[in-house]
Curated annotation (Swiss-Prot):
Protein family membership: Belongs to the class-I aminoacyl-tRNA synthetase family.
Molecular function, one GO term: cysteine-tRNA ligase activity
Protein name, per record: Cysteine--tRNA ligase
Membrane-crossing segments per the record: none
Upper classification of the organism: Bacteria, Pseudomonadati, Thermodesulfobacteriota, Desulfuromonadia, Geobacterales
Cofactor(s) recorded in Swiss-Prot or TrEMBL: Zn(2+)
Keyword vocabulary terms for this entry: Aminoacyl-tRNA synthetase, ATP-binding, Cytoplasm, Ligase, Metal-binding, Nucleotide-binding, Protein biosynthesis, Zinc
Species this chain originates from: Geotalea uraniireducens (strain Rf4)
CDD domains xref list: Anticodon_Ia_Cys, CysRS_core
Length: 494
């Protein structure tokens, strides 16, 4: 099965065929760095990180560009409020964005250009649009004339006349048409500016991405990504100005991730219903957040809530507990795990595990080839984990065959982990990290829990079962669940 992607431009799933065989050029709109990033930003960046990883896993050479918008009205307004230079704001939030993305396990893109470092390219592009009759100067502003670009709105499938009739747009004497958009803004007193043929000013938002993407990827490239909220006006305007300037198709495949919702409303700063990445990571492990963001298909809406994050944490724990059990099995039989498995000698449950483990890479590939369906891919992992748990619970001894099966499962999950960017932690350490984080929210310390477990073990040894039960019940009242095994007593947070 060939990789198929949903192209917003055509509204259909299409076979993904790179313009240049073996190579992929991909641009994703980055953040405007004026404030803390929220979970909507996290989703977009994790989604395209996984797409980047998957394309590379197919043996493709990927040139991945993600920009920073480091000059904008919002940046200037914040700088004025704080009484600092605009670039003090942008640099502060670039560093914070980079830290957030590193915590979420993102790979670095090939290039991360800043708008302010590409002013000459932006000015050249604006001048080209003027020379070709697609843009006009009005005072110190330069605007794009949407009526001159016939395919305008082909991405969002809107109608220009309907939009003009239905919109409540204030008359702007600097525009010939209400939907014309700014390419170059005249600087107001006290604002940062750059010299240009049209006077002192700065670039508009849309032209920045066109100039940077075409510099690093060429006039036509394979993938342009971003959130659905960018389809109009940002990506629509990018298409108009880029294709008007070059006379060539701008992008072959347009990919857009769905919104993160709270109470059925899109999470956004403008609505005031957002949670920053830092706020969420103060409460949940970064791998839990990444797991949650990949638990739905990237184009589907994703409902954000404590309950859904807790459910994601529980699901991830289930997989990691199976990985710990696998590691313990391999540790108990260290000389085995690499030999061939004789399928004909396996029992029913072992044979099911053997088959599902062996087919996992193919099933994962089929899911990802279907428009990067991480939700289905993760479902296959859960299916395999159920088989692992059944086989290990029914096993009467840690045989060589069992170790070989465990080694196969671990290797195949590892291949998937590298693409999804999850299940990459050392399993026992990850579970300890999750447990300690949960315990920190309880009104009992980890040290006290461990002390009581030691006291309970002594009580059981002395056959003081009354005291043993008292300790167990006391801890259960604190949401601490004890699990007794031959290796001792472990605990978890309910």
């Amino acid at each position: 099965m060939a990789l198929r992607v949903y192209n917003t431009l055509t509204g259909t799933k299409e076979d993904f065929v790179p313009i240049e065989p073996g190579k992929v050029k991909m641009y994703v709109c980055g953040v405007t760095v004026y404030d803390h990033c929220h979970i909507g930003h996290a989703r977009a960046n994790v989604v395209f990180d996984v797409i980047y990883r998957y394309l590379r896993s197919l043996g493709l050479e990927v040139n991945y560009v993600r920009n920073y918008t480091d000059i904008d009205d919002k940046i200037i307004n914040r700088a004025n409020r704080e009484g600092v230079a605009y670039d003090a704001i942008s640099e502060r939030f670039i560093k914070e964005f980079d830290r957030d993305m590193a915590q979420l396990g993102l790979l670095l893109p090939t290039s991360q250009p800043k708008a302010t470092e590409h002013i000459p390219e932006i000015i050249t592009l604006v001048q080209t649009l003027i020379d070709k009759g697609f843009a006009y100067q009005m005072g110190g502003d330069v605007n794009f004339c949407v009526e001159k670009f016939d395919p305008y709105l082909k991405l969002s499938k809107r109608n220009l006349e309907d939009m003009q009739a239905g919109a409540r747009i204030e008359v702007d004497e600097r525009k010939r048409h209400p939907m014309d958009f700014v390419l170059w803004k005249e600087a107001k007193p006290g604002e940062p500016f750059w010299e240009s043929p049209w006077g002192k000013g700065r670039p508009g938002w849309h032209i920045e991405c066109s100039a940077m993407s075409m510099k690093y990827l060429g006039e036509t490239f394979d993938i342009h990504g971003g959130g659905k909220d960018l389809v109009f006006p940002h990506h629509e305007n990018e298409i108009a100005q880029s294709e008007a300037a070059s006379g060539k198709p701008f992008v072959k495949y347009w990919l857009h991730n769905g919104f993160v919702n709270i109470n059925s409303e899109k999470m956004s700063k403008s609505l005031g219903n957002f949670f920053t990445i830092k706020e969420v990571l103060d409460k949940y492990d970064s791998e839990v957040l990444r797991f949650f963001l990949l638990s739905a298909h990237y184009r589907s809406p994703l409902d954000f809530s404590d309950q859904n994050l807790t459910e994601a944490e529980t699901g991830m724990e289930r997989i990691y507990k199976a990985l710990v059990a696998i590691d313990e099995t391999l540790a108990s039989n260290p000389a085995t795990g690499g030999e061939e498995i004789d399928a004909s000698s396996l029992g029913e449950a072992e044979r099911e595990l053997f088959d599902k483990s062996g087919s996992l890479p193919l099933r994962f590939r089929e899911a990802m080839d279907d428009d990067f369906n991480t939700a289905l891919a993760m479902g296959h992992i859960f299916d395999l984990v159920r088989c692992v748990n059944r086989v290990l619970s029914e096993a009467k001894e840690r045989s060589n065959t069992l170790s070989a099966l465990c080694a196969q499962v671990k290797a195949n999950i590892g291949k998937i982990a590298d693409v999804l960017g999850i299940f990459t932690s050392e399993p026992a350490s990850l579970l300890t990290r999750l447990k300690d984080r949960k315990a920190s929210e309880l009104d009992i310390s980890v040290e006290e829990i461990e002390r009581l477990i030691t006291e309970r073990a002594a009580a059981r040894k002395a056959k003081d079962f009354k005291r043993s039960d008292e300790i167990r019940d006391f801890l259960l009242g604190k949401n601490i669940v004890l699990l007794d095994s031959a290796q001792g007593t472990s605990w978890s947070v309910k």
